[in-house]
Swiss-Prot record:
<dbReference type="InterPro" id="IPR017981">
    <property type="entry name" value="GPCR_2-like_7TM"/>
</dbReference>
<feature type="transmembrane region" description="Helical; Name=2">
    <location>
        <begin position="278"/>
        <end position="298"/>
    </location>
</feature>
<feature type="disulfide bond">
    <location>
        <begin position="32"/>
        <end position="103"/>
    </location>
</feature>
<feature type="transmembrane region" description="Helical; Name=1">
    <location>
        <begin position="247"/>
        <end position="267"/>
    </location>
</feature>
<feature type="transmembrane region" description="Helical; Name=7">
    <location>
        <begin position="521"/>
        <end position="541"/>
    </location>
</feature>
<feature type="transmembrane region" description="Helical; Name=4">
    <location>
        <begin position="360"/>
        <end position="380"/>
    </location>
</feature>
<feature type="topological domain" description="Extracellular">
    <location>
        <begin position="299"/>
        <end position="318"/>
    </location>
</feature>
<feature type="transmembrane region" description="Helical; Name=5">
    <location>
        <begin position="401"/>
        <end position="421"/>
    </location>
</feature>
<dbReference type="GO" id="GO:0007166">
    <property type="term" value="P:cell surface receptor signaling pathway"/>
</dbReference>
<feature type="topological domain" description="Cytoplasmic">
    <location>
        <begin position="268"/>
        <end position="277"/>
    </location>
</feature>
<keyword id="KW-0325">Glycoprotein</keyword>
<feature type="topological domain" description="Cytoplasmic">
    <location>
        <begin position="542"/>
        <end position="621"/>
    </location>
</feature>
<dbReference type="GO" id="GO:0004888">
    <property type="term" value="F:transmembrane signaling receptor activity"/>
</dbReference>
<keyword id="KW-0472">Membrane</keyword>
<feature type="domain" description="FZ">
    <location>
        <begin position="27"/>
        <end position="166"/>
    </location>
</feature>
<dbReference type="GO" id="GO:0016020">
    <property type="term" value="C:membrane"/>
</dbReference>
<protein>
    <recommendedName>
        <fullName>Frizzled and smoothened-like protein H</fullName>
    </recommendedName>
</protein>
Length: 621
């Protein structure tokens, strides 16, 4: 019974010791030093907030290293909660007392050598500071934790004890913890100014939600993220991406203008194919114009009107470019789908056309494109955002419903039609091979003629198919890029805490937020602006285009015609043969002319077929 009673007494005593924070600590062998001051950072830290600046305890770090850690801790508090409830003299005293504890020196007749000990800050005040600054215990804790991003000094609950017998002292020397809030301010009770660590920009506000609508992205009530986000990519990388966007937009604009002028104005007779192609080119032209609008206004200035603000629906150039690229992209993808359907129908039924007037296609494409763009325009959706190189739809729901759903439908239809086209090509080629191998002489001629027409028509569809495939893969990338970015949004958002910790520790420009890679952003700009150049290479560099220009008034007038004849004559004289050519050379020349004549006849047949394809399917708009 007595044994149980003593055990109970021992347990209660142990519990009381734990509650009051009794703990034996080893003598670390530190030293007392005078506080060196806050340094030349221009920001006040501990001057006036220490109980005894003439004697602070220094152990395993220099004061400069400790001061750096303290700055990181204060930066963290300011980033997390820059309000007066957190950033105030009381919390500064607590932080300074924790990092630079007062030092006491123990001497005595029995003490072998002087002993230096710290006066720790009480645990309750440490916790109070973290609570008022809303610091989560996953970042820093007053109860210790070796795996936390911010390591805080030890804070006892009430007191600590030391065993000083090896120094000639007592075995239970007690040192009470201190209450830093009782430290005299020494005339330093003025309000503390909150700063922002680079590259964040200071812009105090009482309405972060309202200012977000104006284009300011706050990390707290005092600091905004800079624009463009140098925490995601260095400024030089952003400039390169902007330059890609500007250059490709300008070249694409010039290319599509030439195509519109060639097939819309110089072309003596517009056929059904030309009309559809012109509307498709017009869509690509609009996409190029949106890029040139941004370039003319300054890409960075358009996306970032000021270094601390992103463009929103009150910035006219941003809204105009966003609306135009949205409308034009939808308009182009719709005509792309129509063109692909025509190619499939023409290959399936060799040279036949879908009997729908172009005017009805135009009415449908305009209606759909306007319906999906006027709604976002009316709700103020066109604006720039974090990690963007252009102005587009802000909310994911609008992105999905007014752009990516119709784009996805068109791409799905395009995928199906392309598979069907490939199947028809396979059938034609296989049929041609089979008929040439197994047909009788009488039927073989008819079959061969039919297969020849199919193959010839198929050859005429090479460029339209190349056009369709290039457009398919560029828009497929745009579709997948934004889908992937949206799916990784939480991952990017989670990187904000490590980024803030890095900034708090003074990482500056070396700190990185997760986001789309520079390569993916650059390729996004490339895909969005390159298509006008693709169109020019495919459509302009053809025999038909050369014929249109040769027969146009631009090259057939009193001023230009003599110049062309002179150039032709100069080249003819330069490369003409010598009069004293040998018989062998003459023979070779005759053979060459004969071959040229044959090729000319072959070309004539090809031109006839091409002419039949383009000019026999006239259709009133």
């Amino acid at each position: 019974m007595n044994l149980k009673f003593y055990n109970l007494i021992f347990f209660i005593s142990f519990l009381i010791c734990c509650i009051h924070g009794q703990r034996y600590l080893p003598v670390e062998g530190g030293k007392c030093e005078k506080y060196i001051g806050d340094g030349d950072s221009g920001k006040r830290i501990c001057n006036g907030y220490l109980a005894n600046p003439d004697s602070v305890y220094v152990h395993n770090k220099t004061q400069q290293e400790t001061l750096k850690d303290l700055r990181s801790l204060i930066n963290l508090l300011e980033l997390n909660n820059p309000s007066k409830e957190c950033i105030n003299p009381s919390n500064y005293k607590i932080m300074c007392a924790m990092m630079f504890p007062e030092c006491i020196e123990i001497n005595g007749t029995n003490i072998v050598k002087p002993i230096t000990l710290p006066i720790y800050t009480c645990n309750s005040f440490c916790k109070e500071a973290l609570v008022t600054c809303s610091v989560p215990n996953t970042i820093a804790s007053c109860d210790g934790g070796t795996n936390l991003p911010i390591q805080l000094p030890y804070t006892p609950i009430e007191w600590v004890k030391y065993n000083l017998t090896i120094y000639g002292g007592v075995d239970d020397y007690r040192v009470n913890c201190t209450d830093p809030t009782l430290i005299s301010d020494s005339g330093s009770s003025s309000e503390i100014e909150v700063g922002c660590v680079e590259p964040l920009i200071k812009r105090p506000t009482n309405d972060t939600k309202g200012d977000l609508e104006k284009g300011y992205f706050y990390v707290n009530s005092q600091c905004v993220i800079n624009c463009p986000v140098t925490g995601m990519h260095p400024k030089s990388v952003w400039n390169q991406i902007f330059k890609i966007n500007d250059v490709l937009s300008s070249i694409s604009l010039a290319c599509t203008l030439i195509l519109l002028f060639t097939f819309g104005i110089l072309n003596p007779k517009l056929n059904r194919f030309d009309k559809k192609n012109l509307f498709f080119i017009a869509g690509v032209f609009g996409m190029s114009v949106s890029g040139v609008l941004i370039a003319a206004n300054g890409s960075e200035k358009t996306v970032c009107p000021t270094p601390e603000r992103y463009a929103v629906n009150t910035d006219r150039v941003c809204v105009a470019s966003g609306f135009l690229v949205h409308f034009s992209a939808l308009f182009a993808i719709l005509w792309w789908t129509i063109g692909l359907a025509d190619v499939y129908y023409g290959i399936k039924f060799v040279g036949k056309k879908i009997k729908i007037k172009v005017r009805y296609y135009l009415l449908a494409t305009l209606t759909i494109s306007l319906a999906f763009t006027l709604v976002p325009l009316g709700t103020g959706q066109y604006q720039a955002g974090l990690s963007n190189v252009m102005c587009f739809l802000k909310d994911e729901i609008y992105q999905s419903m007014t752009f990516f759903v119709p784009l996805g439908i068109c791409l799905t239809m395009g995928t199906i039609l392309m598979i069907l086209v490939m199947r028809e090509i396979y059938v034609i080629v296989k049929s041609n091979s089979t008929s040439s191998s197994f047909s009788s002489s009488s039927s073989k001629s008819k079959s061969k003629s039919k297969s020849s027409d199919s193959i010839s028509y198929l050859k005429l569809q090479v460029k339209p198919m190349l056009n369709i495939i290039l457009f398919y893969f560029t828009f497929l990338y745009l579709f997948l890029f934004v889908r992937v970015i949206n799916s990784r949004y939480q991952e990017y958002e989670d990187s904000a805490i490590p980024y803030m910790l890095c900034l708090a520790k003074g990482g500056g420009d070396s700190c990185r937020l997760k986001g789309p890679s520079a390569g993916s952003l650059g390729y996004f700009a490339y895909c969005l602006r390159i298509y006008g150049i693709y169109l020019f290479i495919i459509s302009f560099l053809s025999s038909r285009t050369i014929k249109i220009w040769k027969e146009s008034i631009i090259l057939n007038n009193a001023f230009v015609t003599p110049i062309i004849k002179f150039i032709d004559s100069s080249f003819s004289n330069r490369f003409s043969s010598s009069k004293n050519t040998s018989t062998t050379q003459n023979s070779t020349l005759n053979n060459t002319e004969s071959d040229t004549s044959k090729r000319g006849n072959s070309s004539a047949v090809s031109i006839n077929l091409e002419s039949r394809n383009y000019n026999t399917d006239d259709d009133d708009l």
